[in-house]
């Protein structure tokens, strides 16, 4: 089998012809290309219609846009948090590391207990998608659960990279969309810690402008937020949006939070290094080069695995 992570940007995933298609979620993104959510749903509908009848779509039916795309499809398997889903996670609990465990029901009946070694409720959903795929292919249930337990994550996805000199934990994450940001921060909140710091680098001017209000609403779980300059990637600064405007809107939305704009990476590292305390969590967040700040903060002897 060949497994690939497909991206919808520029309809690039429509060049694929998979036998199994997994829909984790559908959300407003890449609006510089799609313009609106209806166009995004049309592309996803085309994607699932390209899957042959002898194949299957495995999808999270708790997402309303996914449900829209799945309408009328017979060759589908669903997962989620309700017994109407084919696979349903119940009795979800988290340990002090934020690692979840849950009971997995299949078609309304208890199937197995799942324990993960990666944090966050979003990984409960991810694990159900992986489980459903392997189960469909005939893999033994015990093999699936053992494999899920052994999985410890991947680069730049809630990636523990080390500690600061005083003992704050440094985590790097690729999240650059409001939905991803909330999932990452929620995962961090489940870990035993003191203050939660986030160093956020917005990614592209078009995304920042199109989802401005959503970004403003996304950081209610943090204690300290530092916003760096927007990472331009492929774009030019012609959209009348800035990190300073984000800072102002976020300060108004979250007056009880420590929120500030800082453009220089070295200054950010110096400030956080002086002010973050023992057992705090520091997340460098974004799809650009914000991870460099974590490297500045980290002591060499504490390098993460």
Describe each region flagged by the PLM:
Residues 1, 53-57, 258-259, 280:
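Short active-site oxyanion
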Residues 12-19:
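Short glycine/proline-enriched loop/turn "hinge" motifs that connect secondary-structure elements
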Residues 11-12, 30, 66, 233-234, ...:
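Short glycine-rich, flexible loops that bind phosphorylated cofactors or substrates
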Residues 45, 73-75, 109, 119-122, ...:
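ATP-dependent carboxylate-amine ligase
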Residues 1-9, 170-176:
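Switch II (G3) loop of P-loop NTPases
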Residues 6-10, 63-64, 265-266, 288-289:
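Short beta->alpha connector loops
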Residues 20-170, 193, 247-248:
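Acidic, Mg2+-coordinating active-site environments of NTP-dependent enzymes
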Residues 7, 79-82, 93, 229, ...:
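Residues at the C-termini of beta-strands that transition into short coil/loop
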